Amino acid sequence: AFHGAGRLVWVNWRGLAEFEDGVAVRMAGSLSDLAERGSSYDALTNLPGRPLFRDRLAQLITLHQGDAVNGDGVPARSGATMFAVLLLDLNGFKAVNDYYGHHVGDQLLQQVARRLESCVRSVDLVARMSGDEFNVLLESIDPAEASQRAQQIAAALAAPYVIGEHTVISGASIGLVSSASSLPTVDDYLRAADAAMYRAKTQSLGVCVFQ
């Protein structure tokens, strides 16, 4: 793409099309300058960070809220703008750092990032929020499918990690909130996902869906 200053730049494009009668009628998305990638991506895992995740979630909320609805307040189209937010917190991460050292903990985070990426589609977004917390944004997905995908992610993260000469067992507690909840803001979705994750962790549920 050409920058406003007239120079050629490489960009990353992420977008979501809206369909009417099977025909794409509009698209919303974002372009990011890859030269500025460093400030928006996590250096350890090479995943998007909190700002990019929040920006994409805000776009999906706007699309979902603007979708045509029927008399019951349910999206009239076939879930094209539905989405789900997952918050994942690794189990026993502090113990891994304390026992094996931070270098092993860092490699564990890198392996978790790659497993998460392998569990989602190209339209989805995986981000590292802070420490051992990750968010996943699943696009164009209904609540039942989102719950199934969260269970698949939980199973993938529970498998042993081989890091050097060590075999590490971790896994994750996952909170899930679907756009079917019709929450109004980014912070509302993140708080709901956090509450569900906390319940999953304290009650050893693996995955907990916000109700």
Region locations from a protein language model:
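Short catalytic/binding micro-motifs of nucleotide second-messenger systems
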Residues: A17, L63, S118-V123, A155-T167
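Cyclic nucleotide signaling catalytic output domains
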Residues: V126, Q152, A156, H166, ...
